[in-house]
Amino acid sequence: MARRGQQPPQQQQQAQPAQKNQAGKFNPAEFVKPGLTEEEVLEIKEAFDLFDTDGTQSIDPKELKAAMTSLGFEAKNQTIYQMISDLDTDGSGQIDFAEFLKLMTARISERDSKADIQKVFNLFDSERAGFITLKDLRKVAKELGETMDDSELQEMIDRADSDGDTQVTFEDFYNIMTKKTFA
């Protein structure tokens, strides 16, 4: 029982997940893998603990949506249920820490990948207009030593251009760069 002015022990644990980790009950080294440090594992564990609001050591769909939103990711209900379905290896309908870590490292990797694609886009968009034109593509082709005529370059733009304005926006470029197959 808690003394007057103190939280009950269970509430103290929930309010201080980092101390719980440092006390030896959680070993981040067990989850470290290439590209992921112990510090990053601890940060993700802290997020997990914060969003495991009922203290069950698992995150349900409602808790996952709040976690993803707070970490800056779009979290539509359909996406949340699909993530749980994809990651819930034990069929519980919830995500434990190992499953959460897998999800978050995939999302972090995706976010980093988008930043890398933005850098490549900026190389094409030399005037920083926010889109790639035939002129931009012609310049890059010339710099790379490619001998392509305007009709070939225009065909490339037409394939990437989703709204028919003869310009390739970053979203168009990103969609092409992340496509698994090309039609």
From Swiss-Prot:
Lineage: Eukaryota, Sar, Alveolata, Ciliophora, Intramacronucleata
Binding annotation for Ca(2+) 2: D88, D90, S92, Q94, E99
Domain of life: Eukaryota
Residues reported in the UniProt entry to bind Ca(2+) 1: D52, D54, T56, S58, E63
Xref: PANTHER family: EF-HAND SUPERFAMILY PROTEIN (PTHR23048:SF59), MYOSIN LIGHT CHAIN 1, 3 (PTHR23048)
Gene3D superfamilies for the chain: EF-hand
Keyword Metal-binding among record annotations: yes
Keyword Ion transport assigned: no
Protein name listed in UniProt: Caltractin ICL1f
Species per Swiss-Prot/TrEMBL record: Paramecium tetraurelia
Summary of subunit composition and partner proteins: Monomer.
SUPFAM superfamilies: EF-hand
Biased composition (Low complexity): 1-19
Compartments it resides in: Cytoplasm, Cytoskeleton
Protein task: Plays a fundamental role in microtubule organizing center structure and function. Component of the infraciliary lattice (ICL) and the ciliary basal bodies.
Segments forming domain EF-hand: 39-74, 75-110, 112-147, 148-183
Stated family: Belongs to the centrin family.
One Gene Ontology term, aspect cellular component: cytoplasm
Region annotated Disordered, chain positions: 1-30
Annotated keywords: Calcium, Cytoplasm, Cytoskeleton, Metal-binding, Repeat
InterPro entries: CALM/Myosin/TropC-like, EF-hand-dom_pair, EF_Hand_1_Ca_BS, EF_hand_dom
Chief localisation class: cytoplasm
